[in-house]
UniProtKB/Swiss-Prot annotation:
InterPro entries per record: NADH_Q_OxRdtase_suD (IPR001135), NADH_UbQ_OxRdtase_49kDa_CS (IPR014029), NDH1_su_D/H (IPR022885), NiFe-Hase_large (IPR029014)
Protein name as it appears in the record: NADH-quinone oxidoreductase subunit D
Function in brief: NDH-1 shuttles electrons from NADH, via FMN and iron-sulfur (Fe-S) centers, to quinones in the respiratory chain. The immediate electron acceptor for the enzyme in this species is believed to be ubiquinone. Couples the redox reaction to proton translocation (for every two electrons transferred, four hydrogen ions are translocated across the cytoplasmic membrane), and thus conserves the redox energy in a proton gradient.
Catalytically driven reaction(s): a quinone + NADH + 5 H(+)(in) = a quinol + NAD(+) + 4 H(+)(out)
Superkingdom: Bacteria
Assigned keywords, A-Z: Cell inner membrane, Cell membrane, Membrane, NAD, Quinone, Translocase, Transport, Ubiquinone
Parts of the chain that traverse the membrane: none
One GO MF term attached to the UniProt entry: NAD binding
Compartment annotation: Cell inner membrane
Subunit architecture: NDH-1 is composed of 14 different subunits. Subunits NuoB, C, D, E, F, and G constitute the peripheral sector of the complex.
């Protein structure tokens, strides 16, 4: 015992020898991590639990979309747009077809413009439902995902009814949309999960047309949003995880080129639907929700309020579309395919259809930039034509790319657990980030 005490006293008498070197360590967050929301690889330099530096690594989902679009006729690249932000499909299509229409000097019929406006907002609600469910799940609130996917499934049925696909719709076309809205909705069939009174209740809103179904949806959806807010907005744990976490000042948001809820959450009222109206946004009434503190909680409140505003817009579009039937595609036969009925009787129509979908059409030489207010921010398409049937250059402006670039500036000084909350409010989808 005396030997141990002598050694201890000797060690304590020489502080230089007892001083240990404390160094930061590096941690790989993702790409195989459920909170990475895809294939994000975030290399974190940590001082204990505190983030000192964050280095995002991207490219793991790069598919060369821009080059693929340059190798095909203009009208054959619409499906590629669906696969960029694969949670906000039709908004991506909208930017691309608007760019083609701008170069060709054509404008979609009024009914098609209202349909596009309506489906842009359906897409916004779908995106935000996915976001609120997955973000809550990241922070431990599991029930919200089940509630959100209940409504999202109904909107997926709307996608399927109008295009035949639940996700990659390819519904928007240069000059209009693929077809008019259907007169009936898909109905649930009897199974071991759905039978009897429960089956009748599920199909009650599906007896009429799609517009009838959407009218019923818009009447009930505000109550559903109230349910999400009951679970989260005043939840003590939710507020502890999001209030004053990931604060982005207005100057920082502008400096990094942020758009959408990320920008509006910092208190900047910028929305392309109001500032640079397209489609029929100048004919509908809606407000722009903005935050005050620029933290994760404000970005949550902005997105929840946006769902309510999107519901208002859909309701107005449904009312107009019910009262105003009409064409949904231009009559310019260089762009619009002939009817299926016409192809059965007319050889010229059949030849025209074949050439349109095999060779496409030549677009006048020029360049344009078209942007839409996608759910995640400004999604833009720069398109250059040299007069051929294929684009000379396609460049896509993805909001998530600009947002992810700011990750290092935003997360410094926060705890590792807060990084999960911040990644969630960034609402990243790597289909558009990596392109």
């Amino acid at each position: 015992m005396s030997e141990f005490r002598q050694a201890t006293d000797a060690f304590a008498s020489n502080p230089a020898e007892s001083k240990q070197e404390i160094r930061n360590y590096t941690m790989n967050f993702g790409p195989q991590h459920p909170a990475a929301h895809g294939v994000l690889r975030l290399i974190l330099e940590m001082d204990g639990e505190t983030v000192v530096r964050a280095d995002p690594h991207i490219g793991l989902l790069h598919r060369g979309t821009e080059k693929l679009a340059e190798s095909k006729p203009f009208n054959q690249s619409v499906p590629y747009m669906d696969r960029l932000d694969y949670v906000s499909m039709m908004c991506n299509e909208h930017a691309y077809v608007r760019a083609i229409e701008s170069l060709m000097g054509i404008e979609a019929p009024e009914r098609a413009q209202y349909i596009r406006t309506m489906f842009d907002e359906i897409t916004r609600i779908k995106n935000h439902l996915m976001w609120v469910g997955s973000n809550a799940l990241d922070l431990g609130a599991m029930a919200v995902m089940l509630y959100a996917f209940r409504e999202r499934e109904e909107l997926m049925d709307v996608y399927e009814a109008v295009s035949g696909a639940r996700m990659h719709a390819a519904y928007y076309r240069p000059g209009g949309v693929y077809r008019d809205l259907p007169d009936r909705m898909p109905r649930y069939k009897e199974s071991r999960w759905h039978k009897g009174g429960a089956l009748k209740k599920l199909n009650a809103a599906r007896e009429g047309s799609m517009l009838d179904f959407l009218e019923d949806f818009t009447n009930t959806f505000p109550l559903r949003v109230d349910e999400y807010e009951t679970l989260l907005t005043d939840n003590r744990i939710w507020k502890q995880r999001t209030v004053d976490v990931g604060i982005i000042s207005p100057d920082l948001a502008r400096a990094w080129g942020m758009t959408g809820p990320m920008l509006r959450g910092s208190g900047i009222e910028w929305d392309l639907r109001k500032k640079q109206p397209y489609a029929k946004y100048d004919a509908v009434d809606f407000d722009i929700p903005v935050g005050t503190n620029g933290d994760c909680y404000d970005r949550y409140l902005v997105r929840v309020a946006e769902m309510r505003e999107s519901n208002r817009i859909i309701k107005q579009c449904v009312k107009w579309l019910k009262a105003n039937p009409g064409p949904v595609m231009v009559t310019n036969f260089k762009v619009a395919p002939p009817s299926r009925e016409g192809m059965k009787d007319d050889m010229e129509a059949l030849i025209h259809h074949f050439k349109l979908f095999s060779e496409g059409y030549c677009v006048p030489a020029g360049e344009t930039y078209s942007a839409v207010e996608a759910p995640k921010g400004e999604f833009g398409c720069y398109l250059m034509s040299d007069g051929a049937n294929k684009p000379f250059r396609v460049h896509l402006r993805a909001p998530g790319f600009a947002h992810l670039s700011s990750m290092d500036a935003v997360v410094r000084g926060y705890l590792l657990a807060d990084v999960v909350a911040m990644i969630g409010t960034y609402d990243l989808v790597f289909g558009e980030v990596d392109r």
